[in-house]
Amino acid sequence: MNKKSILSKTSLGSLFFLFGTALSACSSATTEVISSFSSAQKYFSANKKELNKRNLVTILKDSYNSDPKSTVNSLLAGWKYSLLDQKLLENPMDPSRFSKAFGSNTKDDVNPNISEKGLYLAETYPGVSSQIAQVLGVQSQKVTGFSYSWTSKTKFEVKILIKMKGKVGSDGTSQTLIKSFLGTDSKGSGSNNQNGGVTEKDFEGDQANFDGNFIFTYTQPSDGRRLASNNFDPITGTINFPADLQIEVSTSHEKLNTLMTTNTQVGMIKNRSFKGKSFNLLPFFYYALL
């Protein structure tokens, strides 16, 4: 064997060694970034120039392929941190930061939230969903609880509690809708007798004010969809998380609670389930790191 051949093989072997070392280092760095949400915070705090949606999704996708459980738990921790610790819904909006993460300038795009969009009212009350939102008269909302457990993509649960302060019938349009509800009993006969004795006077003045509890529960999809590598899309900068959603509502207002029990239309909002949904988790993770 001549010297040229020996050198050639030696160089080739060195190249493969270096390439393998580089891949290993890259993989280790990626694992370090997503091993936990706190490690992601630490990494991007020291490497601000690397923090952009495309790069972040690429890193998370790479690590999901090698360690799905750690990656998903890191994503869920970021979701929790932005809502519960950074008080994304309660605090005044930082327009620049918010639009950078969510691509919009409205908190209606935060999931979950108590709004026409966040409550999927159009699916329950087609044609009058905006009026229903006005009936609730949301004055403020605050995330007070966030728990999650992820065993696998076929077994998980995320539960988020939002407390809100509202004012029933906060404008003329919603007052008209309340009259409509009170004019129809649970059988649709046009009598108030089935409304538990509730009348418009029960929502006048300070009696219109109430506290509400909204529980949002996300579980594995019942339609067979599962979180997979292709849900991480660097091009669009999204991480679409498939899940079924249940929204449960209770309030401090005795008469409103009565209506949710006795009136068919009002009662529809009390406990609703939605299948076939997907939720983009990237904005929360990104927002928390900005």
Curated annotation (Swiss-Prot):
User: Which family, according to the similarity comment?
Assistant: Belongs to the MG439/MG440 family.
Lipid bilayer topology: Lipid-anchor
Cite a GO CC annotation: plasma membrane
Lipid modification (S-diacylglycerol cysteine), residues? C26
Q: Which UniProt keywords apply?
A: Cell membrane, Lipoprotein, Membrane, Palmitate, Signal
Q: Name the source's superkingdom.
A: Bacteria
User: Taxonomic lineage per UniProt?
Assistant: Bacteria, Bacillati, Mycoplasmatota, Mycoplasmoidales, Mycoplasmoidaceae
UniProt signal peptide: 1-25
Compositional bias (Low complexity) spans?
A: 186-197
Q: Which residues cross the membrane?
A: none
Sites of N-palmitoyl cysteine lipidation: C26
**Which residues does the annotated region (Disordered) include?**
183-203
Q: Which protein, by its recorded name, is this?
A: Uncharacterized lipoprotein MG439 homolog 1
Please give the InterPro entries that the UniProt record associates with this protein.
Answer: Lipoprotein_3
